[in-house]
Amino acid sequence: MDKVVVITGANSGIGYAAAKIYESKGYFVVLGCRNQEKGIAAEKEIGKNSKFIKLDMTDYESIDNFYNNLTSNFKNIDIFYSNAGIMYVPFSKTKEGLESTLATNYFGSTYLTLMMLDLMKNVVSSRIVQISSIAMYFIKEMRYERLEDESIYSPWTWYNYSNLYRTMFSFELDKKITNFE
């Protein structure tokens, strides 16, 4: 295995398309997917140079298990493609008490990205790709203190916030990481 790419949310949409492209370019593709049935199906469709590993971005234990599985099987990761996300879902909270859209799209993504740095530091050309959307531009005001308040929950607004936070994190991470050597 020469080059390894890890893609979250890899069983459909952008993540699935990226997985197919990377596999066709000779990468070994790790598919991080919440739904086991869909993850296994994606692995079969993408081919022998792929491996499905269960990953639920709302569950820190699942994220830890995913990362531990990676460290057990791979010495280095060349590309981390952080794509997993949810949008426009009814209000719910994770077992940690976080609102689910923010937990998936921002908190879980950030947590895993920070862990992935250790697997990428020895690869000079390593890359982190954070998928976001223009939805962040629809935010009219910031209301940090009310993000867990179900009475004002709006699936659109929380999705917009999650994309803004993800993008802000990416800019801050880029400032802090100048060289893995």
Model-predicted regions and their roles:
Residues M1-E181:
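Rossmann-fold NAD(P)H-dependent dehydrogenase/reductase core
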